[in-house]
């Protein structure tokens, strides 16, 4: 975050402003191999404009991970735009097989880049408007990462501690972990801060190369086996 030199950012600006990056993206997409995402869901996920269902006033999303399960309860009145987007992403399998690529035990854990570069590219420009900050970034609260005003897409983070300093920067929580925070606490964070600030995963390469990049260079990262809306 800015007041500590750290913030839950998406590093999209670097990709958007780097023509070489987009050239590499195009090549990667052409050669991308299928992922474990279900065929029908992959078709939906490639069309963000079609996934705009209004979320229930309150709902729970269950995340089955390589370390166990945790449940997030979402309150639409906290952040309507964020809650709606999250509902559609979870419901349609976007987070399935996604890695927890930025884990900082004294700060937060970040995830939300799809492992298929083609799907990831489809969502890069699917931004939603900012919501007013109605809740503080307390421990266990979930919030979108951003790269600036009105830049939220798919990446989210869970606060490991009370991070009230994020509130005036516009980070609007939309839900909280209601069970399994002990699982969230044990997600692998041995790689440290991501590039270019640290030796951890590079978001740009993850966007362009997908999970293959992480599997090769950061094999110990924990991941989401399946995310679903609880009935």
Language-model features and meaning:
Residues 23-34:
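Bacterial N-terminal signal peptides
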Residues 14-24:
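Bacterial N-terminal signal peptides that target proteins for export
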Residues 12-13, 36-231:
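Cyclophilin-like peptidyl-prolyl cis-trans isomerases
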Residues 1-15:
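Short, Lys/Arg-enriched N-terminal segments with co-localized hydrophobic residues
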């Amino acid at each position: 975050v800015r007041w500590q030199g750290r913030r839950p950012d998406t590093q999209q600006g670097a990709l958007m402003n780097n023509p070489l990056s987009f050239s590499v993206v195009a090549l990667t997409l052409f050669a991308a191999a299928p992922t474990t995402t279900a065929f029908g869901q992959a078709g939906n996920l490639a069309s963000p404009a079609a996934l705009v269902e209004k979320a229930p006033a309150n709902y729970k999303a269950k995340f089955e991970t390589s370390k166990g399960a945790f449940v997030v309860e979402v309150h639409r009145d906290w952040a309507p735009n964020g809650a709606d987007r999250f509902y559609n992403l979870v419901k349609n399998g976007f987070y399935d097989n996604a890695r927890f690529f930025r884990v900082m035990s004294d700060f937060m854990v970040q995830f939300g880049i799809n492992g298929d570069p083609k799907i990831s590219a489809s969502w890069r420009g699917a931004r939603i408007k900012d919501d007013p900050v109605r809740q503080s970034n307390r421990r266990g609260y979930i919030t979108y990462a951003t790269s600036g005003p009105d830049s939220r897409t798919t990446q989210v983070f869970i606060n490991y501690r009370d991070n009230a300093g994020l509130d005036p920067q516009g980070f609007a929580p939309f839900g909280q972990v209601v069970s399994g925070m002990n699982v969230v606490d044990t997600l692998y964070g041995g790689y440290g801060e991501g590039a270019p600030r640290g030796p951890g995963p590079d978001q740009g390469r993850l966007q362009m190369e997908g999970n293959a990049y992480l599997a090769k260079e950061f094999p110990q990262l924990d991941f989401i086996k399946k995310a679903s809306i609880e009935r």
